[in-house]
Amino acid sequence: AVMRWLADALYRRNIEFDMVSSGERDFSAYDFLVVPALYAASDDLLGALDRYVAEGGHLIATFRIGFADEQLKIHHDVQPHLLGRCLGIHYDQFTYPKNVRIATTDGRSALTHDWMELVTCDTATPLAHYDHPFRGSYAAVTENAYQKGSALYLGAFFDDELLEPLLVSY
């Protein structure tokens, strides 16, 4: 569902994309990478994504990235495993949203559904927060400058009317 969400948004905006194998480690040919819900990944792959951004790449990552290794063993460190500095965030809580909207810093909003992480910004700039009485201090969408590149993090599954402008503006 997450891959389809992103692919449909790119398609509607007439943005071509390649599907890249999880065995790939050299992403230098790409202007930007979109990594949807990469729940299980080796440390080697996560390190390659970190290097890609550090060397000037632009990464769009979604919730649940780097949660487990390739054998599905859950990482017990701060999430997202090995990508916290690159993304400029961390989280240790997630929940199922019920009637929760996110609000961007420029006044747009969208309804969340199915998944939301309670993201804390370390070096990232929050682009959207949850419009919720108890979860409003957590970021839903962030952007981080990291060495020579940048990373956009989508910490929730939300409606398309916000996804497309975020992808295009990034």
Report the location of each language-model feature.
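Aromatic-Pro/Gly-enriched surface loop or interdomain linker
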Residues: 1-31, 150
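A conserved amphipathic helix/loop scaffold
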Residues: 28, 36-170
